[in-house]
Amino acid sequence: MAEIERARQLRKKETWAEKLVWSWLRARRFTGYKFRRQHPIGIYYLDFFCEEAELNVELDGSQHGFPDRRKHDLEREKFLQSRGIKTLRFWNSHSRRNAQSTRDTIFNELQARAPHSLPEYTRPMKLVEKS
């Protein structure tokens, strides 16, 4: 029960980048794949996890650039890899400035990892730049 409460707290404190990416991934909007936010696996909470493709999408703020945090992130990735889970990492700033690139990277990884690939026409629509 503590895991569920912790996940709820993390969802309430999401960053602007997490809100942006969640708007793409929630409710199977992203080519029909189901993602969960702040999904607990072991002692870790994954930002966005797709069980079907065993894919974890992480959004990192500037604190992840510090050596001790990078070491922690590496340990976490090794733990997840040992369970067959691939992690994609994006800087928060990248997810906004390069939104289409971020979406394409997630889509391509889903295509490579999911038990069934989707036809190209299911690729998420290109983002339209606001003027």
Task: Provide a role label for each language-model segment.
Residues 1-33, 82, 111-131:
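Solvent-exposed, charged helical/coil patches
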Residues 9-14, 20, 37, 42-111:
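Basic, amphipathic alpha-helical patches used to engage nucleic acids or provide basic targeting signals
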